[in-house]
């Protein structure tokens, strides 16, 4: 009798343990960002917060540095189930993600990353049917991203005038490729992490990214001249996207746990970038990098290019296959006005910003119903 009770107890415990394992849902996340990138700690905080709020029913497995999928392969890898979630950059696969690549063309006008982060998320989630459809083609739900701090040129030699750029090979994706051509340079489409090796091997004369890339992407080891004239922050990336089958497999409470922590993920990422830009300037100027403003003729050339480029962007969108590029352009302008006003009226501190993101965007995501 005692043996029967003992065996029964063991079987019961075993079944309960099996049920707990069966209920655990693993989300495999893929990113090409280097392991030392400043966004990774924020993502890890996000993963831990979701795991805690779901009592461990959701578990994240994170692969960074392209260890599972390269930047170009992540969208297809999430679609095909190699990963469940990932960091997408449509500009790396422009023919497959023309809408995302079109939005990236507006990067030159991103002079306020807090404003444009709000714009980007509200646009993608609620105000751009073409955007939603494009992600659906990858069997994916867009969930969150951030607009980068202004891109600048990181060069191997000191360049100052437009004339200095003639014939130089510079990293140029989306609108930045056209800007490079306008300066007489040769645009090279490489990922931010590939740019370091390209600098080191002499394939690139100038990389293009935020100031923080001196550290985050090791540009400071190969490019000691950073032109501080801002070129707008890149808009063509999305930080957290989830395969639709995985989203649908979650309970409403599990989905809500994810959306609850998206404001802190986005806020942490963009505020990290802003702080890191300033810290890097201080530290790397002491170790030999020159941070400087170019000759006024350089800024004038950039502004002249921007003035005539907006109309070209819309025409370019049509040629990319965007159904209504004018509507997306108009929506971006409307949302810029909305978010600039929100921040002017409420403040730009970290806590306020996260609250605004939640109230205006992430709390509106439908977590109760699966995606049909």
Annotate each PLM feature.
Residues 12, 23-115, 142-372:
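N-terminal secretory/targeting leader peptides
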Residues 8-16:
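Bacterial N-terminal signal peptides
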Residues 1-8:
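Bacterial N-terminal signal peptides that target proteins for export
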Residues 110-137:
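Short, solvent-exposed loop/beta-turn-alpha elements that line the ligand-binding surface or hinge
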Residues 16-22:
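Sec/Tat signal peptide C-region and signal peptidase I cleavage site
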């Amino acid at each position: 009798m005692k043996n029967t009770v003992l065996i029964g107890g063991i079987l019961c415990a075993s079944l309960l343990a099996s049920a707990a394992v069966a209920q655990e849902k693993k989300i495999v996340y893929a990113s090409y960002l280097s392991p030392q990138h400043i966004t990774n700690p924020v993502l890890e905080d996000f993963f831990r917060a979701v795991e805690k709020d779901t009592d461990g029913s959701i578990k994240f497995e994170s692969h960074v540095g392209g260890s599972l999928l390269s930047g170009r392969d992540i969208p297809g890898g999430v679609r095909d189930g190699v990963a469940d979630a990932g960091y997408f950059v449509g500009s790396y696969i422009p023919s497959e993600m023309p809408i995302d690549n079109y939005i990236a063309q507006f990067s030159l006008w991103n002079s306020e990353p807090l404003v444009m982060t709000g714009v980007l998320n509200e646009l993608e989630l609620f105000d751009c049917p073409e955007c939603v459809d494009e992600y659906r083609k990858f069997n994916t739900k867009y969930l969150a991203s951030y607009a980068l701090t202004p891109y600048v040129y990181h060069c191997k030699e000191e360049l100052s005038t437009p004339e200095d750029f003639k014939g130089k090979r510079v990293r140029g994706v989306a609108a930045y490729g056209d800007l490079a051509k306008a300066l007489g340079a040769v645009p090279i489409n490489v990922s931010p992490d590939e740019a370091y090796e390209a600098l080191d091997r002499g394939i690139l004369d100038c990389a293009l990214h935020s100031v923080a890339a001196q550290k985050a992407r090791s540009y400071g080891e190969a490019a000691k001249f950073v032109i501080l004239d801002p070129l707008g922050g890149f808009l063509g990336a999305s930080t957290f996207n989830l395969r639709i089958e995985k989203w649908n497999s979650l309970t409403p409470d599990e989905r809500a746990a994810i959306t609850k922590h998206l404001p802190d993920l986005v806020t942490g990422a963009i505020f990290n970038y802003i702080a890191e830009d300033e810290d890097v300037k201080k530290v790397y100027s002491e170790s030999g990098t020159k941070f400087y403003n170019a000759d006024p003729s350089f800024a004038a050339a950039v502004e002249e290019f921007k003035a005539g480029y907006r109309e070209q962007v819309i025409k370019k969108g049509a040629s990319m296959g965007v159904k209504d590029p004018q509507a997306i352009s108009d929506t971006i302008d409307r949302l810029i006005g909305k978010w600039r006003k929100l921040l002017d009226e409420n403040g730009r501190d970290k806590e306020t910003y996260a609250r605004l993101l939640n109230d205006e965007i992430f709390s509106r995501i439908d977590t109760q119903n699966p995606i049909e």
